[in-house]
């Protein structure tokens, strides 16, 4: 009887192992196919002229240089604001307001906001920033909308990173006479900086891939604006440009070229996040 049960368990374990292996292989094959397909369609259409010039309807040339700059402007503006607010809020909730009822309320609200479709953020951003505050359609309106979208993610990842720092580290620093802020600045933050940086890098990836919210707030102009005034002007990011080249102009080659650039950026960000995590993890183990 025992041998029969043992044989059934081995057969069941083997079957499940094979099924899980097939599922993993299919997932990997799908991702690999997607990467190869996009690159095979996009790389032949990449050129220095495409990357370094602005589009001109008079001469019939196509260029995405303004879209690249607009993407960089929005990423920089968004990440500067969202990191300041998100990390600051996480520090307050974890270190100063720990255990209070407001923490649970804010955490629940943050998790709820994370599940809202981005197009709703775009609609709210258009009504709030573009209309109510009179920013009109501009990169800064798009950046502020993306701040609201990514704030819950940065805040929650920072909170979880702060919680990984052992309480004994804080108590030891307090025992040496250090104040609350000094403990946070010199003990807590250095102990979880890898998680904070990783969360910020992954947020950059989400910002790069956003399009629906920016259609409502940042606009879709392909104009090369002045550096100091670009943030107050409308402009298309790479994702918005991809949509318009594919949907409106029928330029699928250019759309795939932009998709290749975005895919490469996302891959580099994921690699950077992995490198940061491994490096700081190695330093912690050495300590």
Question: Which functions belong to the PLM regions below?
Answer:
Residues 93, 159, 163, 201, ...:
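C-terminal transmembrane helix and the adjacent membrane-cytosol boundary/short C-terminal tail
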Residues 78-110, 123, 273-282:
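Transmembrane-helix boundary motif in ABC transporter permease subunits
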Residues 111-149:
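Generic hydrophobic transmembrane alpha-helix motif, especially the helices
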Residues 117, 176-177, 190:
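Glycine/proline-centered hinge or cleavage motifs at structural transition points of membrane proteins
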Residues 55-62, 214-263:
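Interhelical loop and adjacent transmembrane-helix boundary motif
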Residues 1-24, 273-287:
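Transmembrane alpha-helical segments of polytopic membrane transport and secretion proteins
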Residues 3-19, 36-78, 99, 244-253:
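Periplasmic/extracellular loop-to-transmembrane helix junction in inner-membrane transport proteins
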Residues 158, 180-218:
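Transmembrane alpha-helices
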């Amino acid at each position: 009887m025992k041998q029969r049960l043992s044989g059934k368990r081995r057969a069941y374990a083997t079957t499940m192992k094979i099924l899980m292996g097939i599922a993993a292989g299919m997932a990997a094959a799908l991702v690999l196919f997607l990467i190869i397909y996009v690159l095979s369609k996009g790389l032949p259409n990449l050129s220095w002229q495409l990357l370094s010039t602005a589009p001109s309807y008079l001469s019939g040339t196509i260029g995405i240089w303004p879209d690249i700059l607009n993407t960089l402007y929005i990423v920089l503006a968004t990440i500067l604001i969202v990191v300041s607010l998100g990390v600051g809020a996480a520090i307050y909730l974890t270190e100063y307001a720990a255990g209070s009822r407001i923490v649970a309320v804010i955490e629940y609200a943050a998790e709820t906001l994370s599940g809202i479709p981005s197009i709703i953020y775009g609609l709210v951003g258009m009504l709030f920033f573009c209309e109510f505050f009179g920013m009109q359609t501009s990169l800064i309106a798009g950046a502020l909308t993306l701040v609201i979208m990514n704030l819950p993610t940065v805040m929650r990842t920072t909170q979880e990173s702060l919680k990984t720092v052992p309480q004994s580290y804080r108590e030891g620093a307090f025992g040496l006479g250090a104040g609350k802020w000094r403990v946070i600045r010199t003990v807590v933050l250095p102990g979880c900086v890898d998680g904070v940086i990783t969360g910020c890098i992954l947020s950059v990836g989400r910002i790069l891939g956003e399009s629906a919210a920016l259609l409502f707030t940042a606009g879709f102009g392909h104009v090369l604006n002045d550096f100091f005034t670009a943030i107050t002007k409308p402009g298309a990011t790479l994702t918005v440009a991809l949509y318009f080249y594919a949907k409106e102009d029928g330029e699928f080659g250019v759309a795939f070229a932009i998709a290749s650039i975005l895919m490469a950026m996302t891959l580099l960000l994921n690699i950077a996040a992995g490198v940061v995590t491994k490096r700081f993890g190695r330093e912690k183990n050495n300590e």
